[in-house]
A protein has these predicted regions:
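Hydrophobic hinge/microswitch elements
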Residues: 39-52, 57-58, 107-161
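Short, well-ordered beta-strand segments
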Residues: 3-7, 55, 79, 102, ...
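Beta-alpha-beta core module
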Residues: 63-70, 74, 132-183
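A late-sequence structural motif
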Residues: 15-16, 88, 163-205
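Immediate post-signal peptide segment of exported/extracytoplasmic ligand-binding proteins
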Residues: 1-4, 94-98
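Central regulatory/effector-binding core of bacterial HTH transcription factors
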Residues: 1-63, 129-131
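Secondary-structure junction motif
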Residues: 58, 86-88, 93, 99-121, ...
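Short, surface-exposed acidic/glycine-rich loop or hinge patches that mediate macromolecular interfaces
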Residues: 11, 38, 108, 181-182
Length: 209
């Protein structure tokens, strides 16, 4: 009857939770999961206090008492609806800048990696919509000529047309974090192992496509 509290985005939920619950139904049907999104600056405090068992996020500057391993890595692509006027094999920087963009971020303000890369080139994209949720973006994309920069795995899952980015940005890394006080806890270690194995399977499946 153990309940695990995990901080993650809706993007990570969509990748991790379906295969996790397939596994839990077989191995531990009474285990419960509570998913939420903690503020990044509070991750260490929440893990240390036991209010979170795990956090799944990009690389963070955390306390030395917080352990972590990399779960997933995915490259970013420019995604749009199928049939979009710019749905082709390659985009120039000028074509990318001509698009009306959705920017996904849980923060109220701040630039994304694409914007930082464009800024170094003296360029700026047009962000028409800033949203917290990836899932919402797919609905807007399918009904408009807007574009969104998302991980390749997400674009495939939602049948979006994807084009390589015309600017170089680092891939998205997702790490799993836990507090050292739970490092040897049998339940915590078992759940950690399940999520690491699931991430390995997701990675292998993507590489096989």
């Amino acid at each position: 009857n153990k309940t695990f509290r995990i901080s993650m985005t809706d993007l990570t939920e969509a990748v991790v939770l379906p295969p996790l619950f397939q596994r839990l139904r077989r191995l531990a049907p009474n285990v419960k999961i509570e998913s939420m999104l903690a503020k990044r600056r509070e991750t260490t405090k929440e893990l240390a206090a036991g209010r979170l068992d795990f956090a799944m996020d990009a690389p963070l500057n955390t306390d030395p008492q917080v352990r972590h391993v990399k779960l997933l890595e995915d490259r970013y692509v420019c995604a749009m609806r199928r049939g979009h006027p710019l749905a082709k094999d390659k985009l120039s920087v000028e074509e990318y800048l001509s698009l009306s963009h959705i920017h996904i971020s849980s923060r109220r303000s701040g630039l994304g990696m694409v914007d930082l890369a464009l800024g170094k080139m003296g360029q700026q994209r047009k962000i028409a919509l800033r949203s917290q949720h990836y899932m919402m973006a797919t609905q807007v994309i399918q009904q408009t000529d807007m574009a969104v920069t998302v991980p390749e795995r997400f674009a495939r899952r939602h049948d979006l047309y994807q084009v390589p980015l015309p600017v170089d940005i680092p891939p998205l890394e997702t790490h799993i974090y836990w507090h050292e006080s739970t490092d040897q806890d049998p339940a915590n270690r078992w759940m950690r192992e399940q999520m690491i194995e699931i991430a390995q399977q997701v990675t292998a499946a993507q590489q096989a496509d």
